[in-house]
Each structure stands twice: as C-alpha cells, then as structure tokens.
Regions:
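Generic N-terminal initiation segments characterized by hydrophobic and/or small/turn-forming residues
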Residues: 12, 109, 151-154
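A phosphate-binding catalytic loop at a beta-strand-loop-alpha-helix junction
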Residues: 90-109, 113
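Short linear sequence elements within intrinsically disordered, low-complexity coil regions
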Residues: 106, 145-148
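C-terminal domain-closing interface element
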Residues: 149-161
Length: 161
C-alpha cells in the first residue's frame, strides 16, 4: 500500500484526516508532527514525538485495524460525535491513525454520517479526499454500511456467546 502523499488532507471544511508518516515529492518518508494547526486532534494510534502541542485538545482511543469489540465501536461512535460537534462549532479537527487510511477513515466516515451524509457517500468522500487506499479494511466499510449502532449490537452479542 502506498504511503500518503500529504501529512493530512481536508475531507470537508474543518475536518482533516492524517497519519503519522507521509512521503514527499522526492519519495522520502517523513514523520507527521502536529503542532497547533488544529483545535482538536483525535488519535487512534500514538507515537511519542508526533504531537500535538500540549495546548491542543487531544483525545486518544487506540483501536486495532481489525475486528472491533463493542466497546471499541462505541468509542468510534463517541469520537465521531465529538468531531462532528466540533466541526459544527467551527473548530478544525484532525483524526489520525498510523497510516491515515483505515482507523481514521472509519471515524471520519462516521463523522460525515453524523453531519448528514449517507454511508456510501461518506466512504466515497474519504477515498476521494485522502486516498483510494483509504478504508481498504472491508470490515470497517461493512460496519459503516450496516450502521455503527447495528455493528455495536452485533459485536456485543458475540461477547455473550
């Protein structure tokens, strides 16, 4: 999978998607270090030295790039709700994970759904604005198409069996 060609991309006004590394025009891999560019940073993966600045609101909820349990799906729902509310309030929001494709794509797409988009449109928008490689985790796409509420209930049922 190719590295992103930008540290972050604006998906809709005020809502940005990124990762922890990107490849510049010369092909050199560079770290993404967030300073004070955003009012809120949501990290689904963290590494020391990648920011954001201590003055920036920073929410961390590390989730795997694979099947999620009910509590993790609930975290995605809450983070997306917070991101949508922040965008509506005029704040700039960055959602990031390791590569800036799957976990951040899941939260960004759910944020778009919270902002009134249909799931297929949200998925398409993420891929168009970040990369065709975004949301290549088909399970995350299935969660979005089914609805995270349904995915949460089904994941919760699996823990009972």
């Amino acid at each position: 999978m190719p590295e992103p060609h930008a540290p972050w991309n604006e998906v809709v006004p005020g809502l940005w998607m990124g990762g922890h590394h990107w490849t510049d025009a010369s092909g050199e891999r560079r770290p993404v270090i967030v300073g004070t560019e955003f009012g809120l940073v949501i990290s689904l993966y963290t590494r020391p030295g990648h920011g954001p600045d201590p003055s920036v609101d920073h929410l961390v909820a590390e989730i795997p790039d694979g099947p999620l349990v009910a509590a993790q799906i609930h975290s995605v729902q809450q983070l997306a709700h917070t991101a949508a509310r922040s965008v509506k309030e005029g704040r700039t929001v960055l959602v990031r994970c390791n590569a800036g494709y799957n976990r951040s794509g899941l939260v960004i797409a759910q944020t778009l759904i919270e902002l009134g988009h249909e799931a297929p449109t949200a998925i398409h928008t993420v891929r168009q604005r970040r990369s065709p490689s975004a949301l290549n985790n088909r399970l995350f796409e299935e969660y979005l198409n089914a609805g995270l509420g349904v995915a949460h209930l089904l994941a919760d049922l699996e823990t009972l069996s």
